[in-house]
Amino acid sequence: ALGVKLLSSGDLTSDTTRSVPSASLACAARLDDEALILFTSGTTGVPKGVVHTHRSLRARWLGLRQSLGIACFRRTLCLLPTHFGHGLICNSLFPWLFGQDLIIASAFSPNLLLRPGAIIDEQNITFLSSVPSMWGLSLKGSKPPQGKTLQRIHCGSAPLSAHLWRQIQQWAGIREVYNAYGITE
């Protein structure tokens, strides 16, 4: 339905990775080396560049696992672009690194935002993370999911009003809708 091959962490141990010389798999990076720079205005609206080390990314993922567990991330849907920190770090890499299924939308388009309810049902999604502007379109054009697989929604990267938060809860039919603050806050 999304035109995307489902890739699980188990795929990394397939024959395709056995042909890669083991020396090239070695990581020379140290925990305190810079891993990436996120340029963002985030929830606060103040532009900035935020440097993350391998240690800070690891701490984020381990903190998420400790505080939220991984069960609700069993089938994660990423509607966000993966070049976007929110889409990459917490919405994609976190569930995937801990062995959960990750469904990534092939290309972002406004039409995609008119289908989240259907996608949740078709793919048995348990978790998705999003941004408030996404919900502006989705709540107007998407029917709510009919199945009962969805367990948790995060919404962040921009201010989330109490009114929109309640609308998302009603649309999804769950109470577990959280205003998430990212690693650039």
Feature-to-residue mapping (PLM):
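Short beta-strand->loop structural element characteristic of the AMP-binding/adenylate-forming
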Residues: 1-11, 48-51, 78, 100-108, ...
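ANL superfamily adenylate-forming
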Residues: 1-32, 153
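Conserved pre-ATP/AMP-binding loop-to-beta segment of ANL
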Residues: 20-39, 46, 69-75
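Structural detector for helix-capping/boundary residues
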Residues: 32, 54-55, 123, 175
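Conserved S/T- and glycine-rich ATP-binding loop of Class I adenylate-forming
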Residues: 34, 40-43, 76, 82, ...
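Conserved AMP-binding A3 loop
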Residues: 35-62
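Conserved AMP-binding/adenylation subdomain of ANL enzymes
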Residues: 58-75, 85-126
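Gly/Ser/Thr-rich phosphate-binding loop
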Residues: 125-130, 139-185
